[in-house]
């Protein structure tokens, strides 16, 4: 854009006519030296380590009509919500080595917001959680200053649903955005010992194979928590034993690592299918997995794991079907929601 002069600090890359600015903030960590000492895997630049920033930036302003790749190629071409928008990125959170989460300091977040305003952005997208109780939180005040400067701020409500009064960023000068969803469900099921459990799946065809719980399929000395979660190389180290997993459907707990990472770990260990189970009430999701998979609710977890522990257990992941159930749109179950706790719960 005319008169745009924001910095571009990237690792082995440059800005272009889409990505027009890139800066990072780590003063509260002790600068580059502090990050290098505590997070040696991180990029000392605005480059994204764990892909969350890339994901949100492309959703907001990705180019129009880009052909999807990988399993999602069945969707054809995809676009961001504002494909003609320019993007300037401000990195103030620093990732764990596994990429499952990131953290930072309030002062760096405020510095990033202030810099975006000073650079002259029109919109700030802030897909990071925050306070649910305090209008005077430093980040909320930084957004008040942004709003006073004419900058529109969209901030995430958070992913702490379905519990009530969990919504973050309660301030009235922010547009706080919950997660919505549609009424198209790719329903799936799995049959164990003549009992069928229903969930979500994109399995194209039925698959029958021996069944094993991940907790019984670990490499010697594998961490029990990582084993229950089916950690793989993408999560910092594989824990499934190929000698035990090969040719089998594996039961994995939801949590910590990306759901698709779990099916990748199963594939890398020679498994042919996966049952992913919630450990607490949450959504079930039809993801593009690396092996045929079905996602079940936490209410089925105990029965599934108990059967998987029996000698000779087998499972049949049934072919998925498209269903239309709820009115749409509606709030996704994982999304944070009101009523607000800030300001005496007036909203």
Task: Show the residue positions of the predicted features.
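Loop-rich non-cytosolic ectodomains and luminal regions
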Residues: 1-347
